[in-house]
Amino acid sequence: MASTADFKNGLVLQIDGQLWQIVEFQHVKPGKGPAFVRTKLKNVVSGKVVDKTYNAGVKVETATVDRRDATYLYRDGSDFVFMDSEDYEQHPLPESLVGRAADFLLESMPVQIAFHDGVPLYLELPVTVELLVASTEPGLQGDRSSAGTKPATMETGAEIQVPLFINTGDKLKVDSRDGSYLGRVNA
């Protein structure tokens, strides 16, 4: 059990037999009335996001989530195979569980897998990943009417928006949470 004062992003709650992860939370102290906590919760299994409000100080049931370090090995059909860094056990995770993270996975990449009662719940990638640009069109300075970006296909197959000066073969830092360009990697 945890109080609303213990809320933090990433905390997993057990509500009506389902697991919900706190994506955002905000403590609100209005001028009149009692304080409350506004949360945005994501269902760990389905990915559905809901808003829920709790009175301040309310006790909620938390789920025990074990985060284990692992390494991405290879793709086997629709499964992604990871090796636990502690006991070297291999864990095949279905494509539905890996989700958008599949766009940024490289072989031998360190990741974290969250387990609840021995069942994998979700995958956490490093916030920034370094990827090579597999292909992109040459960007010309005068050929745009808006911001200077163009699509680029990365070595993993992900397509992201990059500045016009990026060329095929460049190594880039990419935010794995939203697929945004962060910068070039200096060689």
Swiss-Prot record:
GO cellular component, one term: cytoplasm
One of the protein's GO biological processes: peptide biosynthetic process
InterPro entries per the UniProt record, alphabetical: Elong-fact-P_C, NA-bd_OB-fold, Rib_uL2_dom2, Transl_elong_fac_P/YeiP, Transl_elong_KOW-like, Transl_elong_P/YeiP_cen, Transl_elong_P/YeiP_CS, Transl_elongation_fac_P
Location relative to the cell: Cytoplasm
Pathway(s) where this gene product acts: Protein biosynthesis; polypeptide chain elongation
Single Gene Ontology MF annotation: translation elongation factor activity
Keywords carried by this UniProt record: Cytoplasm, Elongation factor, Protein biosynthesis
Matches recorded under PROSITE patterns: EFP (PS01275)
Principal cellular location given in the protein's record: cytoplasm
The family this protein is said to belong to: Belongs to the elongation factor P family.
Annotated NCBIfam families: efp, PRK00529.1
Function: Involved in peptide bond synthesis. Stimulates efficient translation and peptide-bond synthesis on native or reconstituted 70S ribosomes in vitro. Probably functions indirectly by altering the affinity of the ribosome for aminoacyl-tRNA, thus increasing their reactivity as acceptors for peptidyl transferase.
The protein, known as: Elongation factor P
Organism: Mycobacterium sp. (strain KMS)
Gene: efp
